[in-house]
Amino acid sequence: MSKQRIRIRLKAFDHRLIDRSASEIVETAKRTGARVKGPIPLPTKMERFTVLISPHVNKDARDQYEIRTHKRLMDIMDPTDKTVDALMKLDLAAGVDVQIKLN
């Protein structure tokens, strides 16, 4: 598997969770002998929702909610077979979405 690259994208609502998962991935990849670039923080997506509190009148009474989606990007250069096996066996937190691409 030489001259290849594994690109890993992480998404989560909690920044502490995504940082912990990223450090676990980096530690696992380095332990198996691969080079790691990252984690690179990507822009945080913020979605804001405004909801009327009152069902009838009082248009000025509103609540605002916000969801932040944090993203990280990592490249694992020259992965070995041990690296791929270790990454597949890695148990990450439930709140982290992981996308893996082989190039």
Curated annotation (Swiss-Prot):
Under SMART domains, the record lists:
Ribosomal_S10
Q: Name one GO molecular function term.
A: structural constituent of ribosome
Cross-referenced SUPFAM superfamilies: Ribosomal protein S10
Keyword Ribosomal protein belongs to the record: yes
Where does the chain cross the membrane? none
Mind listing the UniProt keywords for this protein, alphabetically? Ribonucleoprotein, Ribosomal protein
Under PROSITE patterns, the record lists: RIBOSOMAL_S10
Which Pfam families did the record assign? Ribosomal_S10
Which Gene Ontology terms of cellular component type are present? ribonucleoprotein complex; ribosome
Self-association and partners: Part of the 30S ribosomal subunit.
| Family designation | Belongs to the universal ribosomal protein uS10 family.
Q: What job does this protein perform?
A: Involved in the binding of tRNA to the ribosomes.
What's this protein's name?
Small ribosomal subunit protein uS10
**Species the sequence originates in:** Thioalkalivibrio sulfidiphilus (strain HL-EbGR7)
